[in-house]
Amino acid sequence: MNVYGFNAKSITGEDTFLEDYKGKVILIVNTASKCGFTAQFEGLEKLYEKYKDQFVILGFPSNQFRGQDPGTNAEIQNFCLLNFGVSFPLFERVDVRGENSHPLFDYLTNAKPFKGFNLDDELESKFYNITKEEYPEFLDDDSIKWNFTKFLISKEGKVIERYDSWVTPEEIEKDIVKLL
């Protein structure tokens, strides 16, 4: 199986099939507009603009982590456009973990499980402590831990890599280029 079997509603409510992106490298990201990682939109947009002939970013807003994307779909779209010039495709807000998780995210997290926290890294250690305090049940599974988790997909629709929130778009660029 690959990601091409999934569909989702665009941020404007239109049915979108991931097979429409066949032949492009894809980066799927769960996003939020009120998160400490929200500034990553800038780096994501730069990557998209640089490689958009062969590459696409698909942004899926989620409100599951500290309620950091509470707006309507229109508000989310306007925020992304006005603050970061986001031109890559955005989708309706979805759950990315738990019993109401969008099937695409179930597939992605099964294909690339969570690698664990590197407690020697200051930022990862901080997120481990936040997770332990606020969402201890998250430590027991491979699901998404926070906003801006990213999944890199090959031109054939295969899940190649998972990058957690603290990995910046700039750090991912070399892996994207290898797949172009």
Go through each PLM region and give its residues.
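Non-catalytic, surface beta->alpha helical segment in thiol-disulfide oxidoreductase systems
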Residues: 160-180
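Conserved helix-turn-beta segment immediately C-terminal to the redox Cys motif
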Residues: 23-26, 33-34, 38-61, 66, ...
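N-terminal "domain-start" segment that seeds a small globular fold
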Residues: 1-19
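Short loop/turn microsegments at loop-to-beta-strand junctions
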Residues: 3-4, 26, 147-149
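Thiol/selenol-based redox catalytic cores and closely related redox-interacting motifs
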Residues: 79-81, 85-167
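Thiol-based oxidoreductase modules, predominantly thioredoxin-like and allied folds used
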Residues: 54-72, 87-98
